[in-house]
Amino acid sequence: PFTQLNTPYPATAYIKGFLNTKGIPSVQADLGIEVTLALFNKEGLTKLFQAIRSKEWELNPNCQRILALENNYINTIDQVILFLQGKLDTIAHLICSRTFLPEADAFDQMDDLDWAFGAMGKQDKAKHIATMYLEDLGNLIKETIDPYFGFSRYAESLGRSANSFDELYAAINAQQSYLDNILLDIFEQYIQKVQPKLVCISVPFPGNLYTSLRCGQWIKQHHPSIKVAMGGGFANTELRSLSDPRVFEFYDFITLDDGEAPIEILIDHIDGKKEVHDLKRCFTLLNGVVTYINESIYPDYKQHQLGTPDYEGLLLDQYISVIELVNPMHSLWSDGRWNKLTMAHGC
């Protein structure tokens, strides 16, 4: 959950492609873009403003201004999202007029747009303005109902250090936030529809850790028979010396590095076909002790054996292209051709 808004993170597509070669059915989802789209639409913003107004806040002038412009945001959000999805390019000139979208503090930081985009760069200029519009709404959320909110990361500060689990553990066991509720509503729909035996959560960055723990916690509370595995870049770099057993209140297994062989063996283990000592590059809890198991006789797969990444199930036409900074590289990152190369461990 919560990576880039302009494209799905490729890890799940790689794993799904591999599982296809083994005849193992799987379903994938990008909860980050789904939560973003559930929040940033007319109905979602209406509920958001209602939730904010239902409580007393000590609001700074910027948040007061955004609340005063509530109707302007609610009446323009659907068009902005469609534009950023590339489905409503015709409103670029209207956005660039600076009379269509409400503006708050994010616009104070904008560089000289004419210098940055010239007279003809209407699409990129409009994307930048629309991004600032979303940034203002994001700032309102952070100042009120959810201080951990971020568009491409969530509660990143809690996940930056793996030295201690205390702060993150306390946050996970605190009351669910407004965004948590949206996330878990969507997650529950997938669980009810798919009825999985195993849920694998990719956590590439610190800003994905909190939401993965929330999902694991929800499964343990509502569907304890479902097993939960976590893997990805964060585990590979930060959890190689894992020792805190509290982590396994949310996950059953944590795998390291290339995920294909560990997940295949894990599925066989869950199906009763392999013993726990057969697991590969895997942390789990045995008799209350965090145990790393890596004595498997089964080798990793060669590149030509991994299959083709499969993006089925991802909302490929609904990702949004944003330009946060007046920097040509940001446009290339969002709109340029992505030529995915597997160099090592899926990166």
Positions of predicted regions on the chain:
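Glycine-rich His-Gly loop
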Residues: P1-Q4, H345
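Glycine-rich beta-alpha loop elements in corrinoid/cobalamin-binding modules
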Residues: T3-L5, A11, I15-F18, P25-G44, ...
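Solvent-exposed, flexible loop/coil residues
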Residues: N6-T7, D310
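Conserved phosphoryl-transfer catalytic core
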Residues: A38-L94
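A generic structural signal for well-ordered coil/turn residues at beta-strand boundaries
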Residues: D278-L279, V289, D300-Q305, D335-R337, ...
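C-terminal beta-strand edge segments of enzyme domains
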Residues: S296-E312
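Radical SAM [4Fe-4S] cluster-binding motif and immediate context
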Residues: P309-C347
